[in-house]
Amino acid sequence: MLELDIQRATDAATPEDAALRRWCELALRQRSADSEMTIRLVDEAEGRELNHTYRHKDYATNVLSFPADVPDDLLDIPLLGDLVICVAVVEREAAEQGKSLEAHWAHLVIHGCLHLLGYDHIEDEEAEEMESLERELLAELGHPDPYADDETDTITH
């Protein structure tokens, strides 16, 4: 079971809770244990502030992942961590890249969840594994390969 806390810190239109949950559960299905996580949907100012504070980059990015660093045995439900998603960046990227907004949202939520599971894309081999899993999960939802069109269509964080 996934205990999902969704925080909307913006007045912008965002996906419904059920869609966010569906994307998280799909990405996390390889994890058999119950889990807890938070998704915080933010405006550009908060996105920029968090990206600057934690990554020393002075711009808002699409998704930030904050994996929990608490041993599972200390908690009733293992805490995976938090995702922070900047709504304006998601909307802008989808428009610029000619992607449906729903497909881009699904991609970024899945991408962030995979980071919470320990996947990364710093090294080429890690990136290939992570992107392959993203493609597979998005295909299950009926969404196209997010990396197919252009090498610049990569995750910006």
UniProtKB/Swiss-Prot annotation:
One of its GO terms (molecular function) is RNA endonuclease activity. Its EC number is 3.1.-.-. InterPro entries: MetalPrtase_cat_dom_sf_prd, YbeY, YbeY_CS. Its cofactor is Zn(2+). GO terms for biological process: rRNA processing. Zn(2+) binds at residues 111, 115, 121. Binds 1 zinc ion. It is an enzyme of class 3 (hydrolase). Keywords: Cytoplasm, Endonuclease, Hydrolase, Metal-binding, Nuclease, Ribosome biogenesis, rRNA processing, Zinc. Belongs to the endoribonuclease YbeY family. NCBIfam families: rRNA maturation RNase YbeY (TIGR00043). Single strand-specific metallo-endoribonuclease involved in late-stage 70S ribosome quality control and in maturation of the 3' terminus of the 16S rRNA. PANTHER family: ENDORIBONUCLEASE YBEY, CHLOROPLASTIC. This is Endoribonuclease YbeY. The lineage of its organism: Bacteria, Pseudomonadati, Pseudomonadota, Gammaproteobacteria, Pseudomonadales.
